[in-house]
């Protein structure tokens, strides 16, 4: 998984192999085992219980759902304990395991101090006051 993916998309990838419920914008419901889900929410489900808008229920073997037609998905509660949330908690608490250099004040830690203020006092600096 890429670092640029948002949490909902990562959670969707974690839901592969679990039973999910997908409601489409048209009002139709699909409940089945998620085989695969793409970043754009395109999903493959198998062993589906399909509920039409009028309430009629039928069984389907295999379905591919276009992501732009999805209103929302219901995923299992067990995914609350997914490893990605543990990494997220660590990052929030300041115990980040990221490899990059931070962008805050501590980013220049260990570098020689440049003195107070900006710059080194070269050309364009304010001259000292003579007395």
Swiss-Prot record:
Tissue: Expressed in young seedlings, roots, leaves, flowers and immature siliques.
Pfam families, per the entry: LSM
Gene Ontology CC terms: cytosol; nucleolus; spliceosomal complex
Effect of gene knockout: Pleiotropic phenotypes of delayed flowering time and seed production, reduced root growth, partially defective leaf venation, abnormal numbers of trichome branches and changed numbers of floral organs. The double mutants smd3-a and smd3-b display embryonic lethality.
Coiled coil (residue ranges): none
Domain Sm: 7-79
Signal peptide (UniProt feature, chain positions): none
Protein name according to UniProt: Small nuclear ribonucleoprotein SmD3b
Gene designation per UniProt: SMD3B
